[in-house]
């Protein structure tokens, strides 16, 4: 039997950064039933974090902390990503103009795909995160669109909502590519050299995109293995991403 405490750092994190279902519906301006339909159609992600007395904490990225397989049970308390509000609003607007739920979901995915492809063309760091999308200086369109479909599916399944403050084609490419750049440097500084100033700058750009991650996830997540690691390696203090890190509630 698992118990939740309002003083639990994980509870404080989730309630600081994520919304209950009714708040998300209210932010979009739709009913709970309509939001259920949008989620079921794949217009955006469902629950991102959940807690149940049976299995404890769960996230869409890594499942249950206690190793239990499967989704959270029906009685679990659930929290949703504020970032999802934009896609659900866009889908609601499409429905008002006559689109079906399925068409609204396709329109959201198509917009993401176009943003993703444009970001690959424009961002120099994209080659770190999506090298398979390039042939020399050219984008391989079919590969880029396949990768876009995979990344969109990861958003709808909830994984990216653990990571990103806002999800667009550009923020997806930037997050994956900046993270891969830092990981490559950490793994092999000789092959992927960065000055201290350059490493710090990339960390800052990545931090602008990312949520802190729940306390149980951060050490092994992208912020922990890149930003936290390099800030410490550079002797430039320590990241304090959570309420209470300063010893106060």
Enumerate the language-model features and the residues they cover.
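Primarily N-terminal secretory
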Residues: 1-2
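Short, amphipathic alpha-helical "recognition" segments used to contact nucleic acids or chromatin
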Residues: 5-16
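Sequence-level detector for tyrosine residue identity
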Residues: 11-13, 49, 55, 160
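Polyanion-binding surface elements
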Residues: 15-35
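Major-groove DNA-recognition helix of helix-turn-helix-type DNA-binding domains
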Residues: 31-65
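Long, charge-rich, low-complexity intrinsically disordered regions
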Residues: 54-249
